[in-house]
Amino acid sequence: MPRRDCFMALLETKGLSINFGGLWAVNNVDFQIEPEQIVGLIGPNGSGKTTFLNIVSGIYRATRGEAYLAGENITRLRPFQVYQKGISRTYQSSRLCWDLSVADNLLVGIYTSQDYTLADTFFRPKKVNGQIYDCLDKGLELLRYFNPSLVDRRYDLAKNIPHIDRRRIEITRALLSEPKVLLLDEPTAGLNDEETMTMMDEIRKIKEKMKGIAVIIIEHDMKVMEEVPERIVVFNAGEKIAEGDYQQIISDQNVIDAYIGGEEE
């Protein structure tokens, strides 16, 4: 049953924790994000940021604690069920198929997002194909929003596309299901400084294009978080140690100690 609080975050975790062989990789994390918010997660290497996203997206099963999406408990759902409920994500390492075209990579995401059965594919091909290609048109329009030249290159193989455009394709593919929450794990990994600024600006514009969406960004560089997220959450040793805007975070003694005492990602 959905929770009926007077205030309901779009995504909320309560005491979320996971234990691997006696080590609490994520420990007692309370977190909230509202519609149309962008929140950054940051912390030293191994601090639990990606593990936290893996629990929220159903890849890992929490040892204790709960996660709610729009008031519905999603803690025990499998990844595809979480995806169907409205959480989509990208990964630090590319999930594109290098020997498929840009358009075909979008089609892979579309087919997954529509939850078609084998029977649908064989016995209702016209309906399935019509819906798929309608979604492809939407995907190409999203690509045009990020980079118009990508639409002209939709038949190029992914391996021949610049790295920043591969990131755009992955984000576009994640948006095709029209998620409530978008999780981005180091979307600027492998980009130079100029490309990083461009990418972060494009992420900021996502909430203008997709009304109501909430975005969670993991980044390894504190400076990258200066302009875009409204709020930053800092992890260290599996725990949330600080939360606030950029200026509050960079002056927080717990954060300073965490970065001086550990290797930054």
Cite the ranges covered by each PLM segment.
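Short, Lys/Arg-enriched N-terminal segments with co-localized hydrophobic residues
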Residues: 1-7
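Glycine-rich phosphate-binding loops of nucleotide-dependent enzymes
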Residues: 7-265
